[in-house]
Amino acid sequence: MAKTKNVRVTVILECTSCAQNNVNVNKVATGISRYITQKNRHNTPNRLEFKKFCPRCYKHTLHGEIKK
């Protein structure tokens, strides 16, 4: 019996609003909110996007998958 390739991969979700507005009024970088999760490659071949809480923005924002 042939071995199957590992279907689950680890992905990083990054806040899209923090990535666009990384510099605040004083020109100091505030950082970017990131979450680490897993996805099934066969069920979801395209990039993931979730609404998750961003502690930097203090609200629920869209978090998108980024490359490692």
Swiss-Prot record:
Q: Which GO terms describe its cellular component?
A: plastid; ribonucleoprotein complex; ribosome
Q: What is its main location?
A: plastid
Q: Which UniProt keywords apply?
A: Plastid, Ribonucleoprotein, Ribosomal protein
Per the record, the domain of life is Eukaryota
- Where is it localised? Plastid
- PROSITE patterns xrefs: RIBOSOMAL_L33
A Pfam family cross-referenced in the UniProt record is: Ribosomal_L33
InterPro entries with a match to the protein in the record: Ribosomal_bL33, Ribosomal_bL33_CS, Ribosomal_bL33_sf, Ribosomal_zn-bd
Q: Which GO terms describe its biological process?
A: translation
User: Coiled coil located at which positions?
Assistant: none
List the GO molecular function terms: structural constituent of ribosome
Which HAMAP family does the protein's record reference?
Ribosomal_bL33
What family is this? Belongs to the bacterial ribosomal protein bL33 family.
Q: Report the protein name in the record.
A: Large ribosomal subunit protein bL33c
The organism is Cuscuta reflexa (Southern Asian dodder)
Q: What is the lineage of its organism?
A: Eukaryota, Viridiplantae, Streptophyta, Embryophyta, Tracheophyta
